[in-house]
Amino acid sequence: EVFPFIKNLGAEDETTYSHHMKDARFTIPTPALLTKVVDLVADVPMDDKDTKGDIYEYMLGKIASAGQNGQFRTPRHIIKMIVELMQPKPTDTICDPACGTAGFLVAASEYLNDHYSTEIFANPEAAKRFSEETFFGYDFDSTMLRIGSMNMMLHGVENPRIENRDSLSEAHSHIAEKYSLILANPPFAGSLDNESCAKNIQ
């Protein structure tokens, strides 16, 4: 019962998270181990709104730093520095074309929350824009799409536009002008299909 509940969070609103969780598999092998995990998490004080996101990011740090397809997790302090240098505004449309765990998008959402919370939650329309029309992330790894959408949800952005897309492909080379701010650590390692790669970045 637990895993179907987790998979279906946000399903009634057709959120990004619920979309990417449809095909997820539950890999905790026994009920006893799940009980132990739940008990450990239950002991963590959750009064601070940032705690869930902080725990999640800590667990992400335990994942191998390099995965398949050239995935690298950008260190948190580097992400934070880049976001602070770029100073995103509530009017920005922010994109990470190789989002992975959505670290840049999370940091941008935290920056906006810290500096513009009155503006972004001034009315239902502004809050909806923040949740649904501000953050765009693309990746072609289904696990990363799940992790990224869950990371955003745990940090208060319930329905970002996180989609399955190869940003380097010719098919998506026309979208650059759609965004006012692009934050990214491009996939420098891994294989690249030169045939499908956009001409302007070959």
Residues of each region from the PLM?
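Conserved S-adenosyl-L-methionine
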Residues: Q71-A184, A189-S191
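A mobile, often basic/glycine-rich helix-loop segment
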Residues: D193-Q202
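Tryptophan-centered motif/residue detector
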Residues: E1, G190-D193
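Non-catalytic, mostly N-terminal accessory regions of nucleic-acid modification and defense proteins
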Residues: E1-P90, R161-E170
